[in-house]
Design a protein with these regions (language model features):
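Functionally critical transmembrane alpha-helices in membrane proteins and complexes, commonly lining
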Residues: 15-80, 99-101, 299-304
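Membrane-interface helix-loop-helix regions
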Residues: 47-60, 99-172, 272
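Membrane-interface junctions at the ends of membrane-embedded or membrane-associated helices
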Residues: 82-89, 186-187, 234-246, 280-291, ...
């Protein structure tokens, strides 16, 4: 019945991943603007974005877009493992994608945002907390200490300097899972990944009390579920139909289950199908969207501290819309600088760092996978 599969439309680099990542990053800025302004011209509001109101609190743009980021990441990072020559090659690509931009934004927050917005300028550079934040990249994957001395303490969203970075540690855990599965030859038996995805969805559907005893655990299982769904879409793309009829079914199920208040039951699977359908929709003229550069990671890194800074100086004069527009323009400028002077130059080092590739060459990557899957990465820009 469904002859066309995802494998047929996912060949090569003509896809819309770059556009989708940029869109999701922009929507996170939009969503956060409502959280930054819980009072608007003296009137108390609930801080929910329009999608939160439409769904009666079942979903908001911020959380939804973060989940979609992990969904795309699961697909692309699995492809990255499959195309890597070794564990060292894979680790090098992941490290060069994540850490250069992260290190620079931490320096930016510590030495630009901090002194500009602190109430303790005289002692700011003498406090250990200042430099503990600077070295977030060394310990932040295990413990997030997202505050600087006296910075943003009177903001409506107090203390948090860069609240978006909480996803970094979960992203790194997911990368480790992809590598572990590869080293254990799990991708030769993709049913294991499918079973893991089903288990994670069952845990989320079950609303088990222990999952909500820890916000960190709940956040991890949520993002991890979407990442594994992305892995499943990658490994089973030869079997999953690419069908407009199934797209309509997915969209209709989202609408119906939203209306009856049970959106969580269909959201992960329906979202996965819809997002990947759009990602490989050739008729959308978006395949060259990132030709000027891949600015989505820069938007992710810089948006939160820029929004906090704007609120710090101009809160009485801002609305969620004006905050979104101002923050987007400033953050986009920083993202362009980050791409051209930090991320892109560091990504050119992928062919270097032979010491890491050599030390970990005894863990094969591509050779451990079925030959049919050993293709080049499909994203037009690095993931």
């Amino acid at each position: 019945m469904f002859k066309l599969k995802f494998s047929a439309v996912s060949e090569g680099r003509d896809n819309n991943f770059d556009f989708l990542r940029f869109l999701f990053a922009a929507l996170v800025i939009f969503s956060h603007s409502y959280g930054f302004l819980p009072t608007l011209h003296g009137t108390v509001v609930d801080g929910e974005d329009p999608l939160g109101h439409l769904s009666k609190g079942q979903i908001a743009f911020g959380g939804f877009c973060v989940d979609c980021f992990f969904l795309l990441s699961g697909f692309l990072v699995t492809k990255s493992w499959i195309s890597s020559r070794s564990l060292g090659d894979f680790a090098k690509k992941r490290a060069l994608r994540i850490f250069p931009g992260l290190c620079v934004v931490l320096i930016f927050c510590t030495f630009v945002i901090g002194p500009l917005c602190t109430t303790e300028l005289a002692s700011y550079f003498h406090q250990k907390l200042t430099y503990a934040y600077l070295f977030f990249m060394l310990r932040g994957s295990l413990h997030v200490a997202d505050h600087l001395p006296g910075v943003f303490i009177h903001n409506p969203w107090p203390v948090r300097v860069n609240g978006s970075l909480w996803t970094i540690r979960y992203e790194l855990i997911c990368y480790a899972l992809v590598a572990l599965f590869g080293c254990l030859r799990v991708y030769r038996r993709p049913l294991i990944v499918l079973a893991l995805g089903a288990l994670l969805l069952s845990l989320n559907w079950g609303r088990l009390d222990f999952l909500h005893s820890s916000q960190a655990l709940a956040d991890f299982l949520q993002t991890f579920s979407y990442f594994v769904l992305g892995m499943v879409m990658c490994l089973y793309r030869d079997h999953i139909p690419y069908s407009r009829a199934l797209l309509v079914v997915s969209l209709a199920s989202l609408l119906v289950f939203d209306l009856i208040g049970e959106l969580r039951l269909v959201l992960p699977v329906a979202t996965a199908y819809t997002v990947f359908y759009i990602a490989f929709w050739k008729r959308l003229p978006l395949q060259r969207f990132a030709r000027p550069g891949d600015f989505s990671y820069g938007l992710y890194l810089y948006a939160f501290p820029i929004q906090q800074t704007l609120v710090y100086f101009y809160a009485p004069h801002l609305s969620p819309v004006t905050l979104t527009l101002a923050a987007f323009l400033i953050t986009l400028a920083l993202a362009v600088l980050s791409w051209n002077f930090v991320e892109k130059p560091c990504l050119r080092l992928k062919r270097g760092a032979s010491w890491l590739t050599g030390r970990l060459r005894w863990w094969p990557a591509r050779s451990a996978q079925p030959e049919a899957l050993a293709e080049t990465e499909m994203s037009g820009t690095p993931t």
